[in-house]
Amino acid sequence: MPFVTSAGAKVHFVDSGGSGPAVVLGHAFFMDHELFANQIAALAPEYRVISIDARGHGLTEHDDGAYSFWDLARDAWSVVDHLGIDRVVVGGVGQGGFTALRMALLCPPRVDGLILLGCSAQAYSDVQRVGYRQVTDAWIGTGPLTVIAKMVAGLIIGGDRSDHQPWLAKWLSGDRERVAAAADCLINVDDISDLIGDITCPALLVRGASDPAFDHDAVDLLTKGLGGPAEFHTIEGAAHTPNLTHACEIDQLMLQFLGRLGR
């Protein structure tokens, strides 16, 4: 399995391979690289899709130190550099979008486009931080995981039980404490609203109409704050991971966007 060492982390990724233009994707909190299985199937082999496991998720390993989304962005660039790729389109869902934005800020000339699903440039409010801390503390704690896992599946994934089952199986059989440092990273995400105007590449933004993580105004504010051309789409009936439950619609939007980039 492919791994790259990056500042105390052994970062796992999946690479569809090929010589097509590269698209680097980061998953939402609690998820892993398999969140993008549908997109890899739809985009490859015309595009080279690279899906990265963030620290605290999937097969990526890391030391016990704290980290930020800037560190995750550097992890992602380490993967890109390891693969010998110069220019990429970067994207992600939720926290994966946080990472993508910071990738674009770290290396602007190397990013040809952004694909952001359920994402914002703002820090969380005090109310949001308290709410997320309650959820992650319950997840990491010693109480029954099944109840909280089913609640998280309903909120993040939405859809129906068939969409939930593969992820519930992963969560209930895994190490529930692995997300502790990742939870701190998420809850303490910094506000980059005053920086995103420097991102001038084209951007595709998508929000599930029932996404509990970010409301319409938050994503609209991000769309308008970016320094380049940006389009914002809402997927009716979708929650935080529309690429999972409404894959055909997301795949089509991504293919159209990538086509307009000439990639």
Predicted feature descriptions by range:
Residues 125-130, 142-197:
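Conserved alpha/beta-hydrolase catalytic His-Asp/Glu region
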Residues 7-65:
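Conserved HGGG/HGGXW glycine-rich cap/lid loop of the alpha/beta-hydrolase fold
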Residues 92, 96, 100:
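Gly/Ala-rich beta-loop-alpha elbow adjacent to hydrolase catalytic centers
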Residues 101-106, 111-141:
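Flexible "cap/lid" loop of the alpha/beta hydrolase fold
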Residues 202-238:
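Conserved loop-alpha-helix segment in the C-terminal half of the alpha/beta-hydrolase fold
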Residues 1-23, 45-47, 85, 231, ...:
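Alpha/beta-hydrolase fold catalytic core
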Residues 37-41, 50-91, 252-255:
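Active-site loop/oxyanion-hole signature of alpha/beta-hydrolase fold enzymes
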Residues 238-251:
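Catalytic histidine-centered segment of alpha/beta-hydrolase-like enzymes
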